[in-house]
């Protein structure tokens, strides 16, 4: 996987790209990091969704930065085309599950996720590196696959 380099700079945004990160709860960071929790300061953390950057979590002052190597799970936003990367962390649906599925099976996957959410069985704040529900990622992947399929199937 190719990443851009991320030099440390002090800026109230992503340390390398100078874009705003998505705020995540401290419990998300603590649950998903593979480092000793002694290394995790009690500060605000932001999530970097930029695919070409190895940084996953960073503090606004860039004093704390954690990369893909520090996270227990592979991060979908960093590897959106990875077949064996989870798109849904709570109910364990991978990109390959969705890419290989028929339209009926895709509907069943979305229904499975919705059923789990409605039953209170999801823990996106602890299991998903972005710290929030995966359903948007799942639907975006389905749309991307559907669009790519339509382009491939259109007459030229």
Regions found by a protein language model. Give the residues of each.
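Short Cys/His-rich Zn2+-coordinating modules
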Residues: 1-3, 25-36, 68-73
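Immediate flanking context of iron-sulfur cluster ligation sites
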Residues: 3-8, 39-47, 77-84, 106-126
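Short cysteine-rich clusters marking metal-coordination/redox-active sites
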Residues: 10-17, 48-50, 88
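Short recognition patches in nucleic-acid-associated and regulatory proteins
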Residues: 15-40, 105
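Cys/His-rich microdomains that often coordinate metals
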Residues: 17-24, 52-60, 94
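Short metal-binding segments enriched for Cys and/or His
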Residues: 41-66
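Extended interfacial segments that mediate partner engagement and assembly in macromolecular machines
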Residues: 65-95
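Long, compositionally biased
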Residues: 115-156
């Amino acid at each position: 996987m190719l990443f851009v380099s991320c030099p440390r700079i002090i800026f109230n945004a992503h340390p390398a790209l100078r874009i705003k990160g998505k705020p995540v709860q401290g419990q998300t960071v603590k649950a998903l990091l593979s480092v000793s929790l002694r290394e995790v300061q009690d500060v605000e953390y932001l999530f970097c969704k930029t695919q070409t950057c190895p940084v996953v979590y960073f503090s606004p002052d860039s004093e704390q930065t954690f990369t893909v190597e520090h996270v227990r799970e592979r991060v979908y936003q960093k590897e959106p085309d990875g077949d064996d990367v989870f798109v849904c962390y709570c109910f364990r649906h991978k990109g390959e599950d969705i890419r290989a599925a028929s339209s009926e099976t895709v509907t069943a996957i979305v229904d499975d996720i919705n059923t789990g959410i409605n039953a209170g069985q999801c823990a996106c704040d602890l299991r998903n590196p972005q710290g929030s529900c995966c359903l948007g990622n799942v639907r975006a992947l389905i749309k991307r696959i559907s669009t790519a399929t339509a382009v491939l199937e259109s007459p030229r």
